[in-house]
Amino acid sequence: MNIREWPAEERPREKLLQRGAGSLTDTELLAVFLGSGVRGCNVVELSRGLLVKFGSLRRLLEADREAFVGELGLGPVRYSQLQALLEIGRRHLATSIERESAMDSPAAVRRYLKAMLRHEASEVFGCLFLDTKHRPLAFEILFRGTIDRASVYPREVVRRALVHNAAALILCHNHPSGISEPSQDDVHLTLSLKRGLALIDVRVLDHIIIGDGEPLSMVEHGWIVV
């Protein structure tokens, strides 16, 4: 059945306008984003099939370009639109958190960093630079690729801390494998950066690892001491 023939309260777009986006299912949200179906398949049926194919809304959103554009009803235009929407969401979250008076909630920090890194397909390393009151100054992704002592240069982290006049910072990187537990390289790298930054009186408050599930704090798990 064509969606135009559905009762108004059951159409995803009208439902969103009447009740808000939070009232929609994953299928309905995806249907609103896609806007239209394909021949012989309305947009809700298409959305439902895509979620079954990818396994979840999250996996669809995190799919690489090749997997995404290869599906019926998707393509490079919608892939570009989706990437733009995801980046808008990340920037909105970043701006919202950066307006806070201080980032004194570990949970808020983890939510922020997860939003910044969770959609990265490869391993990336970043820093959240903070002032003397632990208010955010800036967030930067500094390195991409395999994150170890050979690929992350302490002098570059020190240089960026000086550029931002940071008093403290929080290190972060993602594990695309989904496993959050740090490797020995992660621990050694953190200690090396901690020593280097101490020379310019910049404190390393934590190193957050983003995988599947909840982000991991190396401080809370005892891998580093501040």
Swiss-Prot record:
The MPN domain covers which part of the protein? 102-224
Asked whether the UniProt record includes Protease among its keywords, one would answer yes
Superkingdom classification of source: Bacteria
Q: Which cysteines are joined by disulfide bonds?
A: none
Motif JAMM motif: where in chain: 173-186
Q: Which residues are recorded as binding Zn(2+)?
A: H173, H175, D186
Q: Name one GO biological process term.
A: proteolysis
InterPro entries documented for this protein:
MPN, RadC_JAB, RuvA_2-like, UPF0758, UPF0758_CS, UPF0758_N
Keyword check for Transferase = no
Record key words, sorted: Hydrolase, Metal-binding, Metalloprotease, Protease, Zinc
GO molecular function per UniProt: metal ion binding; metallopeptidase activity
PROSITE patterns hit by this protein: MPN, UPF0758
Family according to the record: Belongs to the UPF0758 family.
Recorded protein name is UPF0758 protein PP_5284
Q: Which organism is it from?
A: Pseudomonas putida (strain ATCC 47054 / DSM 6125 / CFBP 8728 / NCIMB 11950 / KT2440)
Read off the lineage from the record: Bacteria, Pseudomonadati, Pseudomonadota, Gammaproteobacteria, Pseudomonadales
